[in-house]
Design a protein with these regions (language model features):
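Transmembrane alpha-helices and immediately adjacent membrane-cytoplasm interface residues
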Residues: 46-117
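Charged, low-complexity intrinsically disordered terminal segments
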Residues: 2-41, 115-511
């Protein structure tokens, strides 16, 4: 066993897992004790009523059909099923969270000329206008922007020098929100600049996911950073208590400088994302830099999760800055998605579906995981069947072998409809990007899997008629040139891989 795993087991995370296991055992023990205490007829009656109420709750709940099937399978497990659903099946907002949500929705970061922009877009394309209207109705943090210059980076290696340069230019505040941070060249270089900026009076706020960093940072790392002047906190901190909210991780990658410059994409703050450390071959990731009005939406997204996590913030207005418009063509919507009931709709899934359903020439997709529901599968198939050139790229070298088996299990249905599947042979492709018809693209953190589309807090940038779409197209062409196309007539999986795929597919909504 590695030192990292031993340290993890001996940390607060190991203790929390142990305590939650004890809590689960205690719940089962209490149930069996009550079963012994009551007469048999009463125990059976209670059991039947519990099963019926649990099944009715699952059937009537507003959730994806695949999730209902999974929970119904779990619910019929004697005793354990309804207890597991009671503990992990559905998250309800506390009164405090409801107040927070109302406060966030009341904040107005939207542009004064937003309506005029939408009407302008409506005149150009009613279909695109419909997509914009859909995104803005699902994510109240989002808005349509122009006056923004964008830069697409096909690799984290290429993004890193520019990111450091931008950090050095900060004058007022820096916001960072990431899923994974690990000490090394990338993070240490960033941290050195952040500490310099703190000395200059720049406000620095850092939010990272507790579970995402549990194997990379010590438990007291936020305290260490706060002593150095960085306002650092863990998102959805692990405590020894059973709760469904542990499933809702902060998978976002957001960096904002003075409300004027912003970054997002697939790259976390660890050395493999800039290929300074080799894991699973060459690490292929992408990012987008925004300069101008659209950064306001990234600022708002950060403040939203900061507020959800911390419960309060001193003054929203001081971050509501009039950022300078920059000469740049195109329209942009930085948007967020996340779990119910914080988000009422699956924003990321809806954005992907809109792009796929409206494509007329081609749709290109990269994703590290391909574990999607029936609706999204059919949308992709139907696009190919109507003559759209649909191509999907996944990794040849996986970071999770079992997940790759499920990913490959999705290939045959898609290929039968004419979808072209590629595997990135140089290594692990972690990019999450979609491009269609040289007109619209999405770059961000949203994988084509249930965790990203249903459970996690995610973010991305919708881009329409941006000059950078040509770079994204060139990046896809480069990816295709070094990837292997999977052919339906030669694609095979072993019997045990098929068995694993079939079993895991039942629990795909939890993967």
């Amino acid at each position: 066993m590695s030192f990292r795993k031993i340290r993890l087991l001996m940390s607060k995370y190991g203790f929390s897992i142990l305590f939650m296991g004890f809590e689960l055992w205690l719940s089962f023990a209490a149930f069996f004790w009550l079963n012994e205490w009551f007469p048999n007829w009463m125990s059976v009656t209670i059991m039947v009523l519990l099963y019926i109420s649990t099944i009715l709750a699952i059937v009537n709940r507003n959730m994806p059909p695949e999730s209902k099937v999974t929970w119904l399978l779990i619910a019929v497990i004697p005793v354990f099923g309804f207890l597991l659903y009671l503990m992990f099946g559905e998250r309800r907002l506390s009164k405090k969270e409801m107040v927070q949500l109302e406060n966030m929705e009341s904040m107005n970061f939207r542009e004064d000329n937003s309506r005029e922009l939408r009407l302008q877009l409506k005149e150009e394309s009613k279909a695109v206008y419909g997509v914009v209207k859909s995104i803005l109705s699902m994510d109240h943090n989002a808005d349509l922007y122009n006056g923004t210059a964008s830069t697409f980076f096909p690799l984290g290696d290429q993004m890193f020098p520019q990111l450091l340069e931008d950090l050095r230019s900060a004058k007022k505040f820096i916001f960072l929100e990431f899923y994974i941070i690990e000490e090394g060249l990338m993070w240490n270089s960033i941290l050195d600049i952040l500490l310099e900026k703190v000395k200059e009076g720049v406000e620095v706020k850092l939010l990272y996911d507790d579970i995402g960093c549990m194997a990379t940072l010590k438990g007291n790392y936020t305290k260490r950073l706060r002593k150095l002047g960085i306002d650092a906190h863990k998102f959805n901190k692990v405590v020894p208590r059973l709760t469904v909210s542990y499933n809702n991780r902060d998978h976002r990658k957001i960096l904002v400088i003075d409300g004027q410059i912003g970054y997002t994409g697939g790259a976390n703050l660890a050395d493999e994302y800039i290929n300074q450390r080799e894991r699973f071959g060459h690490w292929k990731d992408s990012a987008v830099r925004l300069d101008g009005r659209a950064v306001k939406a990234l600022t708002r997204l950060f403040l939203m999760n900061w507020y959800i996590n911390q419960g309060e913030i001193e003054d929203f207005d001081k971050y509501h800055m009039e950022n300078q418009a920059v000469d740049g063509e195109g329209f942009y919507i930085p948007f967020g998605s996340g779990p119910k009931p914080i988000y009422k709709s699956q924003v990321g899934k809806a954005v992907y579906q809109n792009i796929i359903n409206q494509a007329t020439d081609y749709v290109y997709i990269t994703t590290p995981y391909l574990i999607i529901d029936y609706d999204l599968t059919e949308d992709i198939r139907n696009a190919a069947l109507r003559g759209v050139d649909v191509r999907i790229v996944t990794p040849s070298i996986p970071d999770k072998k079992l997940i790759q088996i499920v990913t490959r299990g999705a290939y045959p249905d898609l290929m039968e409809a004419g979808v072209k599947i590629y595997e990135y042979t140089p290594g692990f492709i972690h990019s999450k990007q979609v491009l269609a018809d040289d007109e619209v693209a999405v770059v961000g953190t949203i994988n084509f899997d249930y965790r990203s589309l249903v459970h996690h807090y995610e973010n991305a940038v919708w881009m329409y008629r941006s000059p950078e779409l040509a770079k994204i197209r060139a990046d896809f062409e480069e990816i295709f040139s070094v990837s292997q196309q999977i052919k339906l007539d030669t694609f095979r999986i072993t019997w045990y891989q098929y068995l694993i795929k079939e079993i895991m597919q039942l629990f795909a909504p939890m993967l």
